[in-house]
Amino acid sequence: MGVPSFYRWLIQRYPLTIQEVIEEEPLEVNGGGVTIPIDSSKPNPNGYEYDNLYLDMNGIIHPCFHPEDKPSPTTFTEVFQCMFDYIDRLFVMVRPRKLLFMAIDGVAPRAKMNQQRARRFRAAKDAAEAAAEEEQLREEFEREGKKLPPKVDSQVFDSNVITPGTEFMATLSFALRYYIHVRLNSDPGWKNIKVILSDANVPGEGEHKIMSYIRCNKNHPGYNPNTHHCLYGLDADLIMLSLATHEIHFSILREVVFFPGEEGKCFLCGQEGHRAADCEGKIKRKTGEMLDNTEADVVVKKPYEFVNIWILREYLEHDMQIPGAKKNLDRLIDDFIFICFFVGNDFLPHMPTLEIREGAIELLMSVYKNKFRSAKKYLTDSSKLNLRNVERFIKAVGMYENQIFQKRAQVQQRQSERFRRDKARDKARDNARDNAQASRQFSGKLVQLDSLDEVSDSLHSSPSRKYLRLSLDDNIGVANVETENSLKAEELDNEEDLKFKLKKLLRDKGDGFRSGNGEQDKVKLNKVGWRERYYEEKFAAKSVEEMEQIRRDVVLKYTEGLCWIMHYYYHGVCSWNWFYPYHYAPFASDLKGLEKLDIKFELGSPFKPFNQLLAVLPSASAHALPECYRSLMTNPDSPIADFYPADFEIDMNGKRYSWQGISKLPFVEEKRLLEAAAQVEKSLTNEEIRRNSALFDMLFVVASHPLGELIRSLNSRTNNLSNEERATIIEKIDPGLSDGMNGYIASCGGDSQPSCFCSTVEGMEDVLTNQVICAIYKLPEDIRGSEITHQIPRLAIPKKTISLVDLKSGGLLWHEDGDKRRAPPKVIKIKRYNPEGSISGGRLGKASHRLVLQTINAQPDYMNINSEPALCPNTVFQNERVPKKIPTFKDNGIQWISPPPSQITPKKMNSPQRQKAWKKDETPQSREKSKKLKSSLKVNPLKMKKTKSPQREFTREKKKENITPQRKLTKAQRQVKHIRMMEEAKMIKQRKKEKYLRKKAKYAQGAPPKTA
């Protein structure tokens, strides 16, 4: 599930990490009747070639259970077909050249089971409430005479079957094996790659199985450090896991989730209130624009984007670095991953001090840089925590708790008041609308149609979908068919209205503000004594001594959790049985004395799949288990019946929405559960025993692949052994034959290369000439090598693209922003200092404007300054005095033109288009005057008498004061001087002309121009 809102925070703070995916579309020929698939063996259109593609399959299974771009499936076959199309699209986007790794969630560590249990119990509770509300709405519709289509039975009515050990997950594993065989045998883009399938019978979460593969391969001989990885998944913690690998060339592929200003809208029609899966183009039908078949078949695809980890590393290098401190990027990244654990993770409850929507990450980073890292110490060393430094860091964070709680109370108070005002306004508007409708009903007229033609026209022109297409000339059979279609359309409309009302009802019910069912805040974190009230309400502490004892144990377990998560992210599970035994977390200021804690873990072993189902599923999902297990969940006399309460408390814990509440379920006692399961395990069938077993990853390659010969030779040596014995005999993989992949292979049970691979998906054809061979794949040993990226040999580090200018600063921290809204992020700009006394920016612009106006006002009298305001709206010169005549210099002369004031704009005052427009307004007298003036200037420009402006006269007088007295020249001397100046000017002009002609002749002969 990951960290809520973390991805939104990431793309807002580090926007350049996001790259839009460029997709090719299949080519349609013969008018769209035939579609030519995309050749994935061709270069990637995104300009970046990937070696390995990793699929977190649960991020594919869930969207295919509840798709947004099509109606929900009703059978497993429809789900599988949707998944195959989904994987095809992802494969074409990325086009891996070496490996495709599909990882399905297996049995999770006990620390994750608590969250899975709460989520599945909550889903069952919400489904029961939704079913009850839907039944009431159906009865209401029936009383109103609105017909609804009957309910459709579905195999996928319960999404809780997406859990290891269920029949669905076993069927899915075989369906994916069939899909892999089909693609490797037929698709040219798959021909040279290896495919690894880690299904639900392999213990571990899907994303962590992927990280184990990368981690175990990277430090072995033969591994290429420049391998380009791409990981698909929806969980936000995939970003943390990718950073933890310290692999440079890493991207995450995911759907575009957030559209600015369009959250919660259907992306097909852009309307709110429904998903794209439920969209039937109602908006078009309401306006009478009925969709034809071709329009209805068009599917709008959701866009995708890459999150480039190497860009994120550059951002963090700038954002986490302390000026003057020694730079170690990998350790800074490790510390960043660790501090993000405090704002949310899948294994520990949320700390009440820190909310990511309240700028918690900015606060943590600010404390890290300004108050902690100034000591030049780190919080982590790979997977190990320096608890002394962690305590110092979190103590500095805890100093802001009072300010955070005060600000949070102010924000909640404002939201509550605003909602009450909005609710009162909406109620008044609804009352006014009802009164208006009532008045129209009493004052309306009865419209009588004179003919059947008018009846037909009114029916066909109705904007609603609920109309009857009857033609008076059609026969009775066609009329009956169209009547039946219209009735069916009416039922679909009613069903759509039912879904809309149900969704709105459930949304309002789950909103504490709208429903008015918000719980009273008994802790009151903004008032004195909040710590004592917190432990009294949440942990049932009855005395000061008991509160202190509980606090110490909570701090111990929470610190154990931090250490467990850090090890899990960097080196895998350190204990399968450890879990946090409380529903609530401590405050940041409670984490004291961490250095004295003795923290140790025992590895243990994972649950069996059926035991995990008993631990996480509610009794409403007992159908997902074998028959012999169901009574343990549904029978009141079961020894573990107390694990499955019919109802349970949901603590809103100060939150607004019900989904944010904490499900206070009893924790499962492992010993009691395993003892109860052992009593019924003997009744399992062979197929159920297989579903309840821990299996291995499977490797698939084309028989012509270099690994194909290795698999065949291994199979020939183990043909006479049992399946259990064959799995124990392993062969080391030569990385030279496998594009740098290390590990071991073992023979799989049965035929590793059947000549015909039978279809396991209904309606799909068998693979008749199979060329794919498979084997068991086992990871190599986890060699913990150097995590310092720049020390890895042969590593090609991408060119730097991020600078300080690209960083965004949040300004004030959330709790420091007083009672105002938080200021938007601002771009950090490098400060440039101007010389003393100079002006720039806005001051320079205003000064320039004043200078232009002064110059215009100081023009000679013949310019005839207009005292009327200019008629040029939307310009900076609005209501300023402008000249009626503006000089334009052409051919060493002056042409006076008179533009209309409405055409004067501040841009391109002398452009040819503007001059042409002005010439249209000239009079014959003004044109003749301009010609005379121009001809007189051509005869002797020196005879032109210029009128000096006051500013020019003032400047000239000032200059005269500073000039030393000189002997006054006679008239003859002035004429001689003038002649000499004219001759010098003529000579200079002649030299320039000759120089230009020489260059022109030189370039014409092909001589290259001189370079600077």
Curated annotation (Swiss-Prot):
Keywords: Exonuclease, Hydrolase, Metal-binding, mRNA processing, Nuclease, Nucleus, rRNA processing, Zinc, Zinc-finger. Transmembrane segments: none annotated. InterPro entries: 5_3_exoribonuclease (IPR027073), Xrn1_helical (IPR041412), Xrn1_N (IPR004859), Xrn2/3/4 (IPR017151), Znf_CCHC (IPR001878), Znf_CCHC_sf (IPR036875). The keyword Zinc applies. Residues 990-1002 have a biased composition (Basic residues). GO terms for biological process: miRNA catabolic process; mRNA processing; negative regulation of post-transcriptional gene silencing; nuclear polyadenylation-dependent rRNA catabolic process; nuclear-transcribed mRNA catabolic process; rRNA 5'-end processing. Expressed in roots, leaves, stems and flowers. It holds the Pfam family zf-CCHC. A zinc finger (CCHC-type) spans 264-281. Residues 411-439, 888-976, 990-1012 are annotated as: Disordered. It is found in: Nucleus. Residues 904-914 have a biased composition (Polar residues). GO terms for cellular component: nucleus. Residues 415-433, 918-928, 950-962 have a biased composition (Basic and acidic residues). Its EC number is 3.1.13.-. It comes from the Eukaryota. PROSITE patterns: ZF_CCHC. One of its GO terms (molecular function) is 5'-3' RNA exonuclease activity. Possesses 5'->3' exoribonuclease activity. Acts as an endogenous post-transcriptional gene silencing (PTGS) suppressor. Degrades miRNA-derived loops, excised during miRNA maturation in the nucleus. Involved in pre-rRNA processing. Involved in the primary exonucleolytic shortening of the 5' external transcribed spacer (5'ETS), required for endonucleolytic processing at site P by the U3 snoRNP complex. Involved with XRN3 in the 5'-end processing of 5.8S and 25S rRNAs. Contributes with XRN3 to polyadenylation-dependent nuclear RNA surveillance. This is 5'-3' exoribonuclease 2.
